[in-house]
UniProtKB/Swiss-Prot annotation:
Biased composition (Acidic residues): 466-475
Domain of life: Eukaryota
Modification after translation (UniProt): Ubiquitinated at Lys-219 via 'Lys-63'-linked ubiquitin chains by the TRIM27:MAGEL2 E3 ubiquitin ligase complex, leading to promote endosomal F-actin assembly.
Name of the coding gene: Washc1
One Pfam short name: WASH_WAHD
Region (Required for WASH complex assembly): 1-54
Region: VCA, residue numbers: 357-475
GO molecular function (one): actin binding
Cystine residue pairs: none
Descriptive protein name: WASH complex subunit 1
PROSITE patterns associated with the record: WH2
Residue ranges occupied by any WH2 domain in the UniProt entry: 369-391
Basic and acidic residues: bias regions: 390-406
Keyword Transport: yes
Organism: Rattus norvegicus
Length: 475
């Protein structure tokens, strides 16, 4: 007798107990019953042994957890009476292994004992002859439900099918304004070509037409989008009672005395800021204003006058003119010319000393660098108070100088008054920085040197009237 292999009904099922087949001979039925019971006993023993091993493994794991709990409890009891603060550092990651252990089934590695080779038995008895009456008797004990109804043949449907339940009148069965029953035969009428019949197969081959657009497109209606539901867990603090207690209570059981609630307890494990970032001081911006000196009573002082021009260079030597010997000058004329020269020299010296004494320190001693130079320019009033001359004024002045030179050349007759006038003009040119050798080119003398050009020239000398003077010169 060979073992009957049975297919497993469930995926992953290891064991499969064989069933005893009907209509067996007596010896054959007894042999299969004995084999099935022995197979069931082996399976039961294997199952219970595996369950016992898994229970023992779980018991050892539980014992290890209990040892860890007892160790933690002993540490808690040790530090329970301490009054010093204890730092507890928690790991930034969850304390779990990198690779989790996969779950192993209880029946991992189990083998089906039915696949083992068993001894074969030879039975001498023969099978009984087939008896139909005996088979009919078995139907009483083994009911068999067999469907005897024949399946209906597929009939060609030509109409719309069965009548709907909501039809209230016979006119609803007929096509509009016709006598055709569409539920019996589907047709459509054409007033020109007549009635055309469509079968069920023709209806199936027709192309499906698009349905009408929804109201949101046809009527331009906008559907309101429902608000998404939030399933996040947001715990609430609830009502917290207000407790008025002192800030420090000494000698409390289980409370440390050296508690420190600050950010200087040490570097944290997690990469986070130790505390709030301190606020930086605010800087006030000031607008630069020109320097304005003030008096003690708070009134503003006028800016100092611009520095005067440098002292005049020594006048050039007059050109020698060959002429006839002239009579000696009278003492009155000599004294007049001496007084005029001394007054001009003294006036220019006093003006220079006053200008040096009245000038600001930044101009007199420009040793403080660029800031001092800018400050002195601001105090002097800048380019707006320099009184610069335009090109037209220069051209007009040059014309006047040429005319004066022509008049001087014509009036130069060798007398004493014309010579004195020429010397005074040369003196004025020397003061203004325009010597006879400078020519028409004008160097960068500065705006203040041009201010002296605005001094009006002396009037031309007048010829002395009277015959007495002529008589004196002739004598």
């Amino acid at each position: 007798m060979t073992a009957v292999k049975t297919q497993h009904s469930l995926a992953g099922q290891v064991y499969a107990v064989p069933l005893i087949q009907p209509d067996l001979r007596r010896e054959e039925a007894i042999q299969q019953v004995a084999d099935a019971l022995q197979y069931l006993q082996n399976i039961s023993g294997d199952i219970f042994s595996r369950i016992s091993q898994r229970v023992e493994l779980s018991r050892r794991q539980l014992q290890a957890i209990g040892e860890r709990v007892s160790l933690a409890q002993a540490k808690i009891e040790k530090i329970k009476g301490s009054k010093k603060a204890i730092k507890v550092f928690s790991s930034a990651k969850y304390p779990a292994p990198e690779h989790l252990q996969e779950y192993n089934s209880v029946f991992t590695g189990a083998l089906d004992p039915g696949l083992q080779r068993r001894p074969r038995y030879r039975i001498q008895s023969k099978h009984r002859p087939l008896d139909e009456r005996a088979l009919q008797e078995k139907l009483k004990y083994f009911p068999v439900c067999v469907s005897t109804k024949s399946e209906p043949e597929d009939e060609a449907e030509e109409g719309l099918g069965g009548l709907p339940s909501n039809i209230s009148s016979i006119s609803s069965l007929l096509l509009f304004n016709t006598t055709e029953n569409l539920y019996k035969k589907y047709v459509f009428l054409d007033p020109l070509a007549g009635a055309v019949t469509k079968t069920h197969t023709m209806l199936g081959t027709e192309e499906e037409k698009l349905f009408d657009a929804p109201l949101s497109i046809s009527k331009r209606e906008q559907l309101e989008q429902p608000a998404p539901e939030n399933y996040f867990y947001v715990p609430g603090l609830g009502q917290v009672p207000e407790i008025d207690v002192p800030s420090y209570l000494p000698d409390l059981p289980g409370v440390a005395d050296d508690l420190m609630y600050s950010a200087d307890l040490g570097p944290g494990i997690a990469p986070s800021a130790p505390g709030a970032i301190p606020e930086l001081p605010a800087f006030h911006t000031e607008v630069a204003e020109p320097f304005q000196p003030e008096r003690e009573d708070g009134a503003l002082l006028a800016p100092p006058p611009p520095p005067p021009p440098p002292p005049p260079p020594p006048p050039p030597a007059p050109t020698a003119v060959v002429s006839a010997p002239q009579p000696p000058m009278s003492p009155d004329v000599v004294t007049v010319t001496g007084k005029v020269a001394r007054e001009e020299d003294s006036g220019s010296g006093e003006a220079h000393s006053a200008s040096v004494q009245g000038a600001p320190k930044e101009v007199v001693d420009p040793s403080s660098g660029r800031a001092t130079l800018l400050e002195s320019i601001r105090q002097a009033g800048g380019i707006g108070k320099a009184k610069l001359r335009s090109v037209k004024e220069r051209k007009l002045e040059k014309k006047k100088q040429k005319e004066q030179e022509q008049v001087r050349a014509t009036s130069q007759g060798g007398d004493l008054m014309s010579d004195l006038f020429n010397k005074l003009v040369m003196r004025r040119k020397g003061i203004s920085g325009k010597g006879p050798g400078t020519g028409t080119s004008e160097g960068p003398g500065g705006a203040f040197s041009r201010m002296s050009d605005s001094i009006p020239p002396l009037p031309p000398p007048q010829q002395p009237a009277g015959d007495e003077d002529e008589d004196d010169w002739e004598s």
